[in-house]
């Protein structure tokens, strides 16, 4: 299984926020034997969200989008994903009922806006916050708040299944240049992927 991750948020592009969500998802998917083929960071722009999601939807087995959910002016992910699949958006009664059951702000217009999802989307309840996630075809859309995203991914994790892999980390106190021949020998003789990552101990 090959997955594309799309991280939405102006703050990720300006460096105000570190993209920990993509790193966390990468580790979770790797542990499930799933390959992450691409991570893309894009702004809170409806047209750009639609373009990238449409592109990755066609290229990957599944797309995970994080960020841009909610009723504020810069939360454009719902509309962008809907456009990527040629769908409109609509008030989602099940999402509103869920929000009513867990939110003290259920009567506010702020929460009304949060219950708008693409037509035909499968709602993913938010057990930690308010804004629901959703699924459209092979596209999974999760909140950008890490705690909320973590919880929601745990609910859908069984839907991501790949080939089991083993990862072994070997620390060697030698310059990277001294390892080139041995790395090439490993790659030639065995069906493995080898990465070299210089650090304090190399």
Each model region followed by its residue ranges:
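Short, well-ordered coil/turn elements that cap or connect secondary structure elements
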Residues: 31, 118, 188-191
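Proline/glycine-rich low-complexity loops and linkers
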Residues: 34-41, 48-51, 63-65, 72, ...
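An accessory alpha-helical subdomain
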Residues: 137-202
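Glycine-rich phosphate/diphosphate-binding loop of Rossmann-like nucleotide-binding domains
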Residues: 1-44
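Surface-exposed charge patches
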Residues: 27, 132, 185
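Short glycine-rich or small-residue beta-strand-to-loop segments that form or flank ligand, phosphate
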Residues: 4-12, 62-68, 139-141
